[in-house]
Amino acid sequence: LRPAFIRPKGK
């Protein structure tokens, strides 16, 4: 689980 709100491109 990654912070999508911090890095939306990482998704």
Swiss-Prot record:
**Stretches of the chain forming a coiled coil according to its record:** none
Protein name per Swiss-Prot or TrEMBL: Hyposin-H2
Where in or outside the cell it occurs: the entry states: Secreted
Provide the alphabetized UniProt keywords: Amidation, Secreted
Location (main, coarse): secreted
Give the CC-aspect GO terms: extracellular region
- Tissue range of expression? Expressed by the skin glands.
